[in-house]
Amino acid sequence: MRPSARLLLLAVMLSGCASVATIDVAVQRPSPAEVLRFGVDTFAFANESRTNNPGKPDLYANYCFVMARGVIQFQRFARFEPGAPRLTADEYTERVKRVVARASWRDPLPPDDRVVIPGYASLHAFSHDQEAAVKAGLVGRFWTLVHWTNWRVVFPMPRWQQERVAREALAEVAEGRPVQLLVTNFPTWELNHTVVAYAYRQDSDGNVLFTVYDPNDPREPGRVTFDRAERRFEASRLYDTHVGPIRAFRMYYGALL
């Protein structure tokens, strides 16, 4: 690897919080309630698999990054008003585009400045009733596929770096902020995906169990485990993925990352 490439890789590995509590300290903080409410603050439809749906005419595939990011954007920049009159499908699409046009790492907007979604009480109810309109508004799939940090999946990462990701995720969730993670088991061509971590707990062995929203499965939460002894992540319960070691990286938490 060229020196310039090594420096770039090191910069990405070290990027993030300037000071993060050790994992022993961080995991003792209780996971706050309702950082994200599954089945309320999540989409009602799935990002679909091309492999599992060959020939499907209305296939909605390769939107996992858009959907995971969108859940955070709706949480930070939208406001639902169930008592207000409903809009047309085209008007709803424009509202969705306004929500997702704002970078997901930016601070939440105050209620009066948020994009109003009238006629629905939650993202789940909205995306269930107005699925086509919501999908039409979730733009930007191409840029997620070519995001410059996607190259991280091809490199083995040191265990200390993966522990740092776990510590940062714990710190963010403890402060009430869900965390989007890029997860991969490359070079196995099974998992190059993204999830949103929004809760955590310890198991009896002291491992950290992150509860995640998986865009591929709108029916139940997933789980990603950080094995503290091995200092690595595992796919404990991700849709259509074998249980086993993975690598995880934070996504969309800054202008370059």
Place the predicted regions along the sequence by residue.
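Cys-His-centered catalytic/binding microenvironment captured across papain-like cysteine peptidases
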Residues: 20-26, 188-192, 201-257
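Cysteine-nucleophile protease catalytic domains, especially the papain-like/related folds used
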Residues: 29-160
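C-terminal motif of bacterial Sec signal peptides marking the signal peptidase cleavage site
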Residues: 15-16
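Generic detector of well-ordered alpha-helical segments enriched in charged/polar residues
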Residues: 24, 65, 69, 143, ...
